[in-house]
């Protein structure tokens, strides 16, 4: 069974918490016309932490629904990893990079999904 949409975003958030990702935020971009239906933005402390978070999300989603990201951009050395599931983009960012780019503010008109 393949999972998508908000369920996929929530699954990614749950998987990221297994590796202690910080400050997870799901943004619903459907009403604001973003590049995907949902963003998940999470933070990590260092390069190994970012790599572990992204790997756990990839593993968790594959186990739950057999789905792999269409593309993985960036790497832990760039301090920003994007897992592209089509309808969900997962941004795994170093805390400093996240504070610099402030994606949540850029997409400030998007609804936040807390549960």
Predicted feature locations:
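Active-site beta-strand termini and strand-to-loop segments that position acidic
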Residues: 83-85
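Polybasic/polar functional segments that serve as interface/processing modules
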Residues: 1-35, 47-81, 95-97, 103-115
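Catalytic metal-binding acidic patch
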Residues: 37-39
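Short hydrophobic/aromatic beta-strand micro-patches
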Residues: 41-43
